[in-house]
Amino acid sequence: MLNWDKEYLKLCRKILEEGTVVENRTVNNTIKLPSYSFTLNVKEEFPILTTKKLFSRQAFLELLWIYQVQSNDVNWLQDRKVSIWDEWKIDDKGYWNAEQKVKNPDGTTSIGEVHKYFGEEYKGTIGEAYGFITNKYHGVDRVLDKIINHKEDRDNVLSIWYNNHLDKGVLRPCVWSHEVDITNGVLNMWVHQRSCDVPLGLPFNVTQFALLMNMYARVANCEVGTLSFSIKDAHIYENQVKQIKEQIERGKFLSIYEGYKNTDWLEGQLERYTIEYNKIYDTLSEEEKSNLKKGITPDVIREVMTIKNVILYTLNPPKPELYLNPDVTDFYKFNNDEECKDAKVLNYKDLGRLYIPVSK
């Protein structure tokens, strides 16, 4: 199992075992830890989850949208078949609509429709947030100047938290700043997050900032080192608990089967569980088969499918590495078309999709 998978599952277990249930603006309560931090060695291992499928193309394009293209236009993502921000897109009349908890006159709360008006000039965007901020305040240009001309400086910080813009964006920045340090030719990064949807957001965030630090390192002509995350309010929504428990279960089976070194025995077990999986699969309804492709696993087949996938993983373990086009040294010239051909994860393998709902 990869180091990032181990760290991630440790955090998930800690939230479920020690977290506090709290209400929030969405219709789903969260289980939260007030703070959490970790450090990953990106030089030794490119961090991408394998205990569930991570769509790196979409993750990379979102990162480029914010820091390279410096845009708040959701259409840019949609043109590249990235739907991450669809739920937060301001409509053609200038409204953003959501179902959230609202306070009643008597002080109680209920679920209601929220319609926030931003203005027609913001249609198709997320308002004054993320890429809007990086563009307006030229934060990336400052980072690039520092890593090229002032490597020794201790103030290489990029923040996208500006109080005068917070109410003009649909969503306030979750990852709100990062810092860069170069020492002895090694670039390290610290990422600060005020709120973290651990099942959905964190897997993307870690892989994205691992890409960003590699892009910075390319520009600065240095190596990558460690990536550190500091999180306030690390949480799991209550409607995500079942899926996270399934992912934790995958990790448990993986820990068990990785201990077996007898390849012949593992291949025999693979044949056994494949036959059993096929038998159960044939009994599923068409709806269940369709859901399975989306990452919604019927209980009747979950354990057998997990063990089969774990054995396949164990027989040929993944060794993910980042391919970053070696011919590109200009931060703004890395390809950001739909294919995202200048940045790819090689040698990646996962234990299958998990459908995890969004709360907004």
Question: Which residues make up each language-model segment?
Answer:
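Terminal, non-catalytic protein-protein interaction segments that mediate quaternary/complex assembly
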Residues: 1-360
